[in-house]
A protein has these predicted regions:
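Non-catalytic cap/lid and distal C-terminal segments of serine-dependent acyl enzymes
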Residues: 1-269
Length: 269
């Protein structure tokens, strides 16, 4: 057990870990309770400094293990590193804070799920991993609700984030009603409903927005929302890359196109 400004930190035993995955639980000031993170720590980072930190956000119903044991994110990253196509990176895959079926990664009355990601996860992981520092590039990505989180938080904290990539994204919090009974928009705390729209933050911070890409499957129920975001960004002349591929709102799609995200981040470094 390690004492830290994040209260009690529990890490899995390296002797029992597999596939370069490490499990982390710590007391989060933003959540006011414990939070969970799965880490991918390739062996190459042990001798490196200031390596990139990639935060992958999951969708509704999921948790910190979703990107690994449903999406094989660590296997994709390991393959790309071994092929020399991706430099060694640390990947942090946090839970969304476990509010209802999905917190939306926004501030609620009971807990701040936005600060959980941007302050606690990024801060605690950087504190624990010697290869990371304040100079490490920070990249955000996610799928569905996690795509919304990556787009919104990446745009809101544009000065801190080096790149954004999202898959099959919810583009406004109210769209989660298509997936869950209790949408987090009713519990969200913000100055105006506009702040729950990813486009609001992209427009507000257009001058400092980091490199941005997003994609969606042509058979995805969110395809029209993603096309509308693409069109709106074009009309505002905000640089971005938007791609459509065959596929739906499935792990098969996200497993395949995580490669696009990681190679996009590599191109920025």
């Amino acid at each position: 057990m390690i004492m830290s400004e994040y209260r009690h930190i529990e890490l899995s035993d390296p002797n029992l870990e597999r596939d370069h995955l490490r499990l982390l639980t710590f007391g989060s000031p933003a959540l006011k309770r414990r939070g969970d993170v799965t880490l991918f720590l390739p062996p190459e980072v042990e001798t490196l400094l200031n390596v990139p930190l990639v935060i992958l956000l999951h969708g509704v119903y999921g948790s910190h293990w979703s990107w690994t044991f449903s999406g094989g994110a660590h296997l994709t990253a390991r393959k790309l590193i071994a092929e020399g196509r991706l430099r060694p990176v640390v990947i942090a895959m946090p839970s969304d804070g476990l509010w209802g079926d999905g917190s939306g990664y926004v501030t609620h009355a009971s807990a701040d799920y936005e600060k959980w990601i941007m302050e606690d996860v990024a801060g605690c992981v950087t504190e624990l991993v010697p290869a990371l520092s304040a100079r490490s590039p920070l990249f955000l990505s996610g799928l569905s609700m996690g795509g919304y989180g990556a787009l919104r938080l990446g745009a809101k904290y544009a000065g801190r984030v080096s790149g954004i990539s999202a898959h099959s994204s919810v583009t406004h919090l109210h769209q989660l009603k298509s997936f869950v009974d209790d949408s987090p928009d009713a519990d969200a705390i913000c100055n105006s409903a506009d702040e729950l729209n990813v486009l609001y933050w992209m427009k507000l911070h257009r001058e400092t927005l980091p490199p941005l890409r997003f994609d969606c499957g042509m058979g995805d129920l969110l395809i029209e929302e993603n096309r509308q975001l693409h069109q709106a960004l074009n009309e505002m002349q905000i640089p971005h890359t938007y791609q459509e591929f065959p596929g739906g709102h499935t792990w098969e799609y996200w497993q395949k196109h995580l490669t696009d995200t990681l190679l996009f981040f590599e191109s920025i470094c």
